[in-house]
């Protein structure tokens, strides 16, 4: 291999290491949902929520727990690390093969209890989790969003 080729290869490898890790996750369905929720809040005069790694983790963990246990419902206690003084949870299940982020948000917005959490100005952090799989034998998308205030 010529010296020029080795230098080009080295430059490409170094450049690939410098790309922020968040870029891959920025296009994930969970990141898209958080952007849609923030747009929904901002359209109603509220500030956007900050994404929390801890709330992302707890949301994803609980979505997986529901999918694998066959239970769909709110949990009694949200298990998120960090010092949150207040936490909220919304969940949604979509049956079928098509992931519909907008449909999940519309379902929450049309539910008074869920909409109250979406538009609660006391929350400043958010996390989203999505698990897709089989729930009682049917293809299902399971959403969980956790909201927090420190």
Please describe what each predicted stretch is.
Residues 22-28, 42-51, 88-98, 102-105, ...:
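Second-shell loop/turn segments in exported
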Residues 57-101, 118-120:
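Short, surface-exposed glycine/acidic/tryptophan-bearing loops
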Residues 1-26:
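Secretory targeting and sorting signals
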Residues 27-68:
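A short alpha-helix/helix-coil micro-patch that ends at or immediately precedes a cysteine
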Residues 98-150:
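Disulfide-stabilized extracellular recognition modules
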Residues 54, 79, 131:
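Residue-level "edge-of-site" marker
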